[in-house]
Every structure is written in C-alpha cells, then in structure tokens.
C-alpha cells in the first residue's frame, strides 16, 4: 500500500509539471502566431506593396487592385508597364522584383522585364529577359516576336525566322510576325520576299503604318512607283507624321528624270513637312537642293538655303550649296563667301575646299 501511495504522489507531481509545460508551450505558440500575424501585416503594408499617395487616377486604380489582391503578380506587372511608360524605371523594376517574389515561374514577368529594359536601352538585359521568358514558356508569342526582332538586329536570321514561324503556327493572323519577316528579308536584301511579307502584314492589319512605310522603302530602293502609293497610305493613317512625307519627297526627286512633274510634287511634300514643323531645317535644305540640281532655279535655291541656315546656323552643307547657287548666277563674290563660311563651320570639308580652289583658279 505504501508503495502504491508513493507512486500516485509521484504521478501527481509529473502531471503538474506536464500541465505547466503545456501552458508555457501554448503561450509560446500564441506569441509566435501573433508575431507572424504582425509580420504579415507589415509585409502587406502599403509601403511594401509599393503604394504611395498619388493623384494619378490610373495609378490609384492599379494600386486598388494590388491592395485587394496583394499576391497577384499580374497587378505588379501592370503597374510596372505603367511606370515604364512614365519613364519611372526604378519603380517599374521594383515591381518586377515584387512579381518575381510571388511567382518566379511566370513567363510574362520576364517578358515585361525585357520590354522595360529595352525601353531603357539596356538591350543586353532585355535579350536575356526574353530568353528566360521562352525558357519558362517556349510558345510565348510576344516573347518569341520581341526576341526575333532583336535576333534580326544581331544577324541571327535563321533563329529569328524559326521564332517568327513558331508564332505563325499558333496564329496565322499576327501582323507583327509578317512585319518582322519583312524586316528580315529586307536586311538580307531579298526585296521580293520583303515586299510580300509587308503586304501580308497590311492585309492582316490595314492600319499598319510601319508596314506601309517599309514597303515604300523597299519599292523605292529599285524605283518601283508603288513606293508613292505606300507612302500615301501611311500619310492617310498619320497625316501629321513627317516621315512618310519626307520619304515620299526623296522618292519623287530621285525619279524626276523619268517624270519631271515629280519635282514639283516633291516640293509640295517639303511644304507639308514645314506645315507640321516650321523649324525642320532639312526640308528647307532639300527644297534648295531640288531648285539647285534639278530645276536650275538658283534664286529660289538661295532663298531655301537661307531659311535652312536661319533654322540651323551650323548647317555647313546649306552654305556650300548656296555657294553653288551663287556660282550658277555668276556671283563669285557671294559664292566665295559661302564657301569660306562652309569651311569655317567644317574645316575639313573637302568638297568646299576643292570648290573654293577651283573658283579662285578661274579668276
């Protein structure tokens, strides 16, 4: 009996110690849970989510999405793209880091990072981002095309074509894919396939401005009059863009020998450009060049070169060509003055030095 009572007493002591231990452990768990909750609150705080007070309504709308779904990586990518458009690259890159922290396996994260790095002209990093995008998803259409565009620039033509065709096997109605094919073939000087690719891009997307412009350049490279029509289509899409007027004017003045009316039409294009930007000195210069070289109207050439130099006082080519206009009029004094001006602006201007020597030798 005594031994039994002693055993019961020892068990009671052990039970009390066990209860105390359980209580302490429970307290530790409660404290740890509370600490974790506080930590989570801190992790999801506005500051850690990249949310600042702003009057920008678009940014506020994106921030609201992030607040509602802080673990949705797509919201951070949306904000990164928005920041990149504002050239706030530090903020954009921070959102890429947040997106990767949520799920680093998503191809869209690396595609967006590539676009942002490319916008910053960090092309090596952009190329690596696109490679990672395709590692995560080899069928990622946008990633394939952006990497293909860079591969064309790097002369990786076979790889670029493979990537473009991978996209077209998924969807044959991607205008940008045909446009890139056009660029590739144009770069390797296959004008037939280049033009065909641009035409297909236009068929898929009749408002594809860049495809019209580059199709025009391909046609212009071998004097095809279709160049003018492609440039006209580009002008219809963007009537306030200088580029298509300028390209059209160059084509017209270079083909004026076969069709002399092209010279006047080229002058009209330059006037259109000056209506868009009155300070575009190259348009004044090119007008002067048409008057000097093609129309032999030296006075109008002088007037145009005057305006080119007024807009750009360092335009040494304008001074040189104005000198030639004065020579055409028989005014050697002003011609010599302009040749000296051209050499003052560009001391190693060989053509001006030779012309000045010839002019003085005639005296």
Each language-model region and where it sits:
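Bacterial Sec-dependent N-terminal signal peptides
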Residues: 1-52
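N-terminal leader/linker segments that initiate helical-solenoid repeat arrays
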Residues: 37-97, 101, 361-363
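Terminal, low-structured helical/coil segments at or just beyond the last alpha-helical repeat
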Residues: 42-46, 254, 320, 324-363
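Structural signature of tandem alpha-helical TPR/SEL1-like repeats
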Residues: 52-61, 87-98, 120-132, 154-166, ...
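Helix-start (N-cap) detector for alpha-helical repeat units in TPR-like alpha-solenoids
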Residues: 73-74, 107-108, 141-142, 175-176, ...
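Position-specific recognition of the canonical hydrophobic site in helix A of tetratricopeptide repeat
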Residues: 84, 111, 118, 145, ...
């Amino acid at each position: 009996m005594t031994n039994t009572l002693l055993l019961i007493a020892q068990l009671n002591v052990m039970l009390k110690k066990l209860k105390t231990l359980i209580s302490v452990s429970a307290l530790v768990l409660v404290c740890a849970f509370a600490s974790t909750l506080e930590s989570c609150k801190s992790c999801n705080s506005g500051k850690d989510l990249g949310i600042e007070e702003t009057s920008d309504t678009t940014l506020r709308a994106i921030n609201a999405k992030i607040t509602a779904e802080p673990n949705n990586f797509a919201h951070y990518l949306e904000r990164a793209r928005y920041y990149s458009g504002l050239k706030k690259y530090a903020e954009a890159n921070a959102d890429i880091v947040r997106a990767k922290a949520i799920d680093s396996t998503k191809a869209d994260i690396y595609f967006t990072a590539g676009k942002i790095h490319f916008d910053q002209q960090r092309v090596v990093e952009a190329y690596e981002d696109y490679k990672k995008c395709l590692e995560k998803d080899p069928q990622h259409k946008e990633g394939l095309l952006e990497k293909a565009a860079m591969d064309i620039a790097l002369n990786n033509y076979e790889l670029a074509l493979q990537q473009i065709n991978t996209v077209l096997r998924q969807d044959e109605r991607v205008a940008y894919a045909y446009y890139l094919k056009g660029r590739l073939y144009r770069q390797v000087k296959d004008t037939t396939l280049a033009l065909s690719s641009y035409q297909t891009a236009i068929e898929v997307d009749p408002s594809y401005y860049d495809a019209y412009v580059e199709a025009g350049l391909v046609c212009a490279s071998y004097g095809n009059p279709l160049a003018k029509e492609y440039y006209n289509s580009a002008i219809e899409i963007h009537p306030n863009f200088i580029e298509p007027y300028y390209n059209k004017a160059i084509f017209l003045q270079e083909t004026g020998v076969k069709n002399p009316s092209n010279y006047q039409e080229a002058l009209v294009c330059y006037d259109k450009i000056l209506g868009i930007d009155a300070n575009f000195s190259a348009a004044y210069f090119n007008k002067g060049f048409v008057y000097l070289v093609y129309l032999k109207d030296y006075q109008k050439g002088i007037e145009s070169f005057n305006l080119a130099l007024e807009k750009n006082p360092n335009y040494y080519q304008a001074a040189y060509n104005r000198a030639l206009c004065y020579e055409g009029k028989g005014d050697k004094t002003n011609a010599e003055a302009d040749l000296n001006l051209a050499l003052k602006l560009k001391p190693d201007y060989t053509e001006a030095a030779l012309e000045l020597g010839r002019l003085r030798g005639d005296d």
